[in-house]
Design a protein with these regions (language model features):
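Small-residue hinge/turn detector
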Residues: 107-119
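Glycosyltransferase-associated regions of secretory-pathway enzymes
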Residues: 1-106, 122-258
Length: 258
């Protein structure tokens, strides 16, 4: 297996250090008061700039308030590129640079940041629903079944560092860019359809579900309870703030690669 990283040994076996139990009173989601966390307590999100639209800013603040023990980091486009440049081989950075849709770049980056640091990636259009806390997801890795039940919805990913599903996804994106591969839908080059090559939708770790009612009402369910919801107005804010065409439009035009 070729090395993926410049400064990371894939063959190094790390012991998972279980952190001390954390007491969280008044958690609506569960009656548990103690959690044996193995997932690093990081929350990662990305937007093309650090200057967020007002409703998006409020959603981010809600995440921070609900999860004070977590390290939160917002990456802009430059931060995303610098992380890949720092930790990964030149062909991964080249793939990032040659992807045109911002969403495709964000797909590659989210796999990279979780592979390096571990933690939780969440699309910036989501906010906690009814006080949900991410500590509920930190006892194991988690993936989300997409609404069509045929893909892995990558708007939320919970991962240990060194995750091999993410490693394989990164390598496949590099190959797709090099071959200018489009696949049979716009979610194939970097997103939910790509991930199903490396983890089955029937895998026990795929234990959350994406539910789509309309553009302002997308939910993520855990144990049949809604825990995350898109904030109202996110679609309007994104349309005003976007600096590139939607990835679906670019895919239809066969214009997702440089």
């Amino acid at each position: 297996m070729k090395k993926l990283l410049l400064n990371y040994n894939l063959n190094r076996k790390k012991k998972i250090q279980k952190k001390p139990h954390i007491i969280l009173p008044n958690n609506y989601f569960t009656n548990k008061s103690e959690y044996n966390c193995v997932i690093p307590q990081n929350i990662f999100q990305t937007w093309h700039t650090k200057l967020l639209p007002p409703l998006m800013f409020n959603a981010v603040q809600k995440i921070k308030r609900n999860n004070p023990r977590f390290h939160y980091k917002l990456y802009d486009d430059n931060d995303c590129r610098e992380l890949i440049k720092k930790y990964f081989r030149p062909d991964v950075l080249d793939a990032y640079d040659r992807l045109i849709p911002g969403a495709y770049k964000a797909d590659l980056w989210r796999y990279c940041v979780l592979f390096i640091h571990g933690g939780i990636y969440l699309d910036i259009k989501y906010a906690p629903y009814k006080g949900f806390k991410f500590i509920n997801l930190c006892e194991s890795e988690h993936y989300v079944l997409d609404a069509d039940r045929a893909g892995i919805y990558n708007a939320l990913m919970v991962s240990l560092p060194g995750n091999q599903v993410l490693y394989k996804a990164i390598r496949r994106i590099v190959e797709n860019v090099q071959n200018k591969y489009y696949g049979n839908c716009c979610l194939t080059p970097t997103g939910p359809k790509l991930l199903t090559n490396f983890i089955s939708t029937n895998d026990p770790l795929v234990d959350l579900q994406h539910s789509l009612i309309d553009v302002d009402n997308k939910f993520i369910y855990y144990q049949n309870i809604p825990v995350l919801k898109t904030y109202s107005g996110h679609d309007v804010e994104k349309s005003y703030a976007s600096i590139k065409k939607h990835y679906g439009e670019l895919w239809n035009e066969r214009n997702v690669y440089i």
